[in-house]
Amino acid sequence: MRPLSFAYLNFVLILSLILSACGFELRNYANSLDNQTISLDANNSFLNLEMENQLNLKGYLNPSYDSQSTISIKILNHVVNRYVGSAGPGATTTQVRLDYKILYSLKINGARETQHTFEDISYIDFNQSDLLAFEREEEITKEDFIRKAIRNLEFVISANLNEIK
């Protein structure tokens, strides 16, 4: 073993020991919604069904508690708009901009209903010959939009719950 690699190994070992000793850990999203029951009111669009599916996977929705739910979410508008632009010689390279927007009303513990909006933008580059790959990429991007919207929703609900306390 060379002296340089031994010194590097010692450095990494000491650094990891220091970081673990001071309580450092990777980002962990708050689970302040674990003991809350959430009801979701939305139409049967693809985006709303995907959001409902992701909320179910996190364990936030429980259909048996609909009448007793402490948090009520009503999705008013949920859209992804697609804008296409071409650049380059012969316009062979195309870039698509996906604009995501969700408008929802939130009611916590029977308090006043408030409206919230979350917006996000993503750009996808693709070649005309890779149309199937682009469609899959667009689907993945929509799922990512919904994950970000749920994180934002968790933040808004947690902030409102802290204000109520």
What are these regions (language model features)?
Residues 18-21:
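C-terminal motif of bacterial Sec signal peptides marking the signal peptidase cleavage site
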